[in-house]
Structure formats: structure tokens, C-alpha cells
Amino acid sequence: MSKYIIIDSREKPKAIGKILDHFDKNGIEYEVSKLLFGDYMDWNRPGIVVDRKQNIAELAKNCTVEHERFRREMEKAQKAGATLVVLVEQNRYKDRDSWIEVNSIEDLLRWSSPHTMVRGEKVYRVLASWTAKYPLRVEFCDKRQTGRRIAEILYSGDPGLK
């Protein structure tokens, strides 16, 4: 089965240049079209959709200010029988004088935004609730590995994904 990814038309070309480079270098075909939810989906395997987040701050915004909009997106995924994998392009953050590695939502507990009053504990509670209620998975990666991770998620043999 060939690899053919649909990229949501609302993804900004400048933001995804390195992702497209990865797809091109690895023979992954793609086209840009509007998706009902998420940002990346394999044409042949629509049960998994990746929703890319630029950083933890964007994820936090989805959990707070944009809570209702993002909840509706998860409901669309659930109704379609799809798993929504949120891929955050940040896998560490600075906490005072040290770097904290982020491998799971639990690692967000100590996070805080220098620009807003949002605390990691709040983000964690919202995500824990959502992952229990919706077909949602949250992953973190280094920004340089986003294209590779999207392909791995969409083409993995992970039984936890449809």
C-alpha cells in the first residue's frame, strides 16, 4: 500500500517546510486539502489523524482559551471513528535553571507559561480528562523530527491506533 498523506489546507506552508522535505525525501506522496479535523491523515488509513501543535503554549491554549473549539474537534474525530493524535513540536522546557524532558502529559505538571497565567497542572487535568473521554493521544517530539514522527504515527503497527 502506498503512502499518501492529506495535509489540512489551513497548515501554513512556511511552518511545515521541513515536514514536506521529510515526506519528499522518503517518497511519501501528499496533497493539500481541507480536513474536517486534525492536520495530517493517510488517505488509505483515515482512522488515525495527527493534529500538530507548534509548542506546549499552543497546546495549553487549546486546553483553556480554545477549549470548546478543540472539544468539538475531538467529538468530530470520535464520531468519525478516528483516533486523534496530538503531536506537540516541543519535548522539553526550561524550569528555572534546568531543562525538563516531556514524554507524556504528566511531564507538564511543572510547566508554566511566561506569557500567561496558565499552569501545567491545569493543562494536565484537561488532557487527562479528554484522553479518558475521547479517542485522543498526546505525544511530544523535537521540532526537527516532526515529519518523521507524523509518518511513524500514520504508518505504525500500533494496535492502540485504528
Regions found by a protein language model. Name each.
Residues 1-46, 57-162:
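Non-catalytic C-terminal interaction segments of nucleic acid-processing enzymes
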